[in-house]
């Protein structure tokens, strides 16, 4: 998958002040991710990979029996927001780094957790291999990521306008299972859940995506300014999905529990 990593970093850095106000789905998914595991068994050194503004980090601090927590994010303003939010907590290391290049030694982490962040990695197969490298024997990887049904309404609406890529592509359950197996993970539990969010308008959805930092970041996309005519054509096509004067947006979330 070809992603513009510099663009991703800029987008999330710019969204650090607005992220929490629109991240309800992210919080819901994070809670459900932790409910699927026995958090009291999360001990030792834990890594929140792609911590964003620190919601999952905070939940892990409250629920687990951690000794050391590492909060890692590619966008420094996001990491600073987490640090500010958790200023009264101890034994937390804040690391500004790319999840695809973990600055960690081998077999130093007991558990890696990640909530709706790994979809922004170019090569998940390499990411899983590196995660396995840093995990201790019997360590586990617990994460959620978006699946291919995500924003299919927006994708189909843009398809009526042109043939350019306007919506990010996401890996399927089958692809994720393959990558995990190739990386050496066993007994992976994979679950797909579809969430439908509803918005007053297509513009409201677009603004939420911007405030989340989740704009279109596929490298090689059409970088020309979208005309008003093209945008209106997309909106007209999208509004055909309207139900009770609201436009739906599908988010497929794939949750995974994998052990070394």
Q: What residue ranges belong to the model's regions?
A:
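Class I SAM-dependent methyltransferase Rossmann-like catalytic core
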Residues: 2-31
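Conserved alpha-helix/loop element of class I SAM-dependent methyltransferases that forms part
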Residues: 24-44, 59
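Class I SAM-dependent methyltransferase SAM/SAH-binding core
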Residues: 47-101
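Conserved Class I S-adenosyl-L-methionine
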Residues: 53-55, 189-260
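A short acidic, Gly/Pro-enriched loop at the edge of an enzyme's catalytic core
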Residues: 100-111
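A short SAM/SAH-binding and catalytic strip from SAM-dependent methyltransferases
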Residues: 110-123
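A short glycine-rich, Lys/Arg-flanked "PGG" loop and its adjoining helix->strand segment in the class I
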Residues: 125-137
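Conserved catalytic/acceptor-binding region of the Class I
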Residues: 138-202, 212-224
């Amino acid at each position: 998958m070809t992603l513009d990593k510099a663009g991703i970093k800029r987008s999330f850095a710019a969204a650090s002040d607005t992220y929490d106000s629109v991240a309800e789905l992210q919080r819901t998914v994070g809670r459900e991710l932790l409910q699927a595991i026995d958090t009291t068994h999360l001990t030792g050194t834990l890594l929140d990979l792609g911590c964003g503004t620190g919601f999952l980090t905070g939940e892990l601090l409250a629920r687990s029996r951690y000794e050391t927590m590492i909060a890692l994010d590619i966008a420094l303003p996001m990491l600073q927001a987490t640090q500010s939010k958790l200023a009264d907590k101890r034994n937390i290391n804040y690391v500004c780094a790319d999840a695809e290049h973990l600055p960690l030694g081998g077999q130093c982490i007991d558990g890696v957790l990640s909530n709706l962040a790994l979809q922004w990695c170019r090569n998940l197969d390499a990411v899983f291999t590196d995660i396995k490298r840093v995990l201790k024997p019997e360590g586990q990887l617990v994460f959620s990521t978006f699946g291919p049904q995500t924003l299919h309404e927006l994708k189909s609406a843009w398809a009526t306008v042109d043939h350019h890529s306007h919506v990010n592509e996401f890996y399927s359950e089958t692809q994720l299972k393959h990558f995990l197996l190739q990386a050496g993970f066993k007994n992976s539990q994979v679950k797909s859940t579809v969430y439908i969010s509803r918005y007053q308008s297509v513009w409201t959805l677009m603004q939420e995506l911007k405030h989340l930092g989740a704009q279109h970041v596929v490298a090689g996309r059409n970088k020309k300014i979208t005309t008003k005519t093209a945008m209106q054509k997309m909106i007209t096509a999208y509004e055909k999905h309207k139900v009770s004067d609201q436009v739906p947006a599908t988010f497929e979330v794939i949750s995974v529990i994998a052990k070394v």
